[in-house]
UniProtKB/Swiss-Prot annotation:
GO biological process, one term: tRNA N1-guanine methylation
Subunit field text: Homodimer.
Organism annotation: Serratia proteamaculans (strain 568)
Protein's recorded name: tRNA (guanine-N(1)-)-methyltransferase
Gene name tied to this protein: trmD
Protein family: Belongs to the RNA methyltransferase TrmD family.
Length: 255
């Protein structure tokens, strides 16, 4: 997969190229990340990349010419078919479904805004899609771009040690992940659930699914509203809800 980055701070992306899962993907040739700075496409001695907005108002906008030339350079390096994405609060909110869609693109270019944003005409002429990572304000598009790269890279074949890791992540099937445990078996009186030690893979799968459903119901109930539960899932969720209610009653009775 090729990912081009247009950013005033390309050095920030060493966090992606040098470390962790994405760093290994780059090292192993599974992911190529290249950066272009609009500042390298300026022609004045101050290397100016921002200007005042027409109509007044606070802040500055990224200038059209350096930004467009940086995007064009990234497009030329990517070749035909590269999707150009602007990280923007006005964009479609990134979720696991969106990540899967983006992961199907072998080439993409991520444009990171700064200041108060970019000239609307750049969006109209150069941008294919706008994406957001949430309804809050950041100083620029670099962190959203890194979030997108990290999430998409997990779907590149060979990046993860076990492809099932991506398939079993939270949100992969519309649910939150189940609890996980490792050694020691007992920690300060808290024991690993016996079913996980049983070796009964069918029961372990059932327990994990029930916990995943229950955790989603407790923490993100709106996710369940968009899911058509299977008969097994409906039964397991009802079991979890009954068990949770019993625990709550026992707790309140002991207070």
């Amino acid at each position: 997969m090729f990912i081009g980055i247009v950013s005033l701070f390309p050095e920030m992306f060493r966090a992606i190229t040098d470390y962790g899962v994405t760093g290994r993907a780059v090292k192993n040739g599974l992911l190529s990340v290249q950066c272009w700075s609009p500042r390298d496409f300026t022609y004045d001695r101050h290397r100016t990349v921002d200007d005042r907005p027409y109509g007044g108002g606070p802040g500055m906008l990224m200038m059209v010419q350096p930004l467009r030339e940086a995007i064009h350079a990234a497009k030329a390096a990517a070749g035909e078919g590269a999707k150009v994405i602007y990280l923007s609060p006005q964009g479609r909110k990134l979720d696991q479904t969106g990540v899967c869609e983006l992961a199907a693109n072998p080439k993409m270019i991520l444009v990171c805004g700064r200041y108060e944003g970019v000239d609307e005409r750049v969006i109209q002429t150069e941008i294919d899609e706008e994406w957001s990572i949430g309804d809050y304000v950041l100083s620029g598009g670099e962190l959203p771009a890194m979030t997108l790269i990290d999430s998409v890279a997990r779907f590149i074949p060979g990046v993860l040690g076990h492809q099932a890791s991506a398939e079993e992540d939270s949100f992969a099937d519309g649910l939150l992940d189940c609890p996980h445990y490792t050694r020691p078996e007992v920690l300060e009186g808290m024991e690993v659930p016996p079913v996980l030690l049983s070796g009964n893979h069918a029961e372990i799968r059932r327990w994990r699914l029930k916990q995943s459903l229950g955790r989603t119901w407790l923490r993100r109930p709106e996710l369940l509203e968009s899911l058509a539960l299977t008969d097994e899932q409906a039964v397991l969720l009802a079991e979890f809800q009954r068990e949770h209610q019993t625990k709550q009653q026992d707790y309140e009775g002991n207070v």
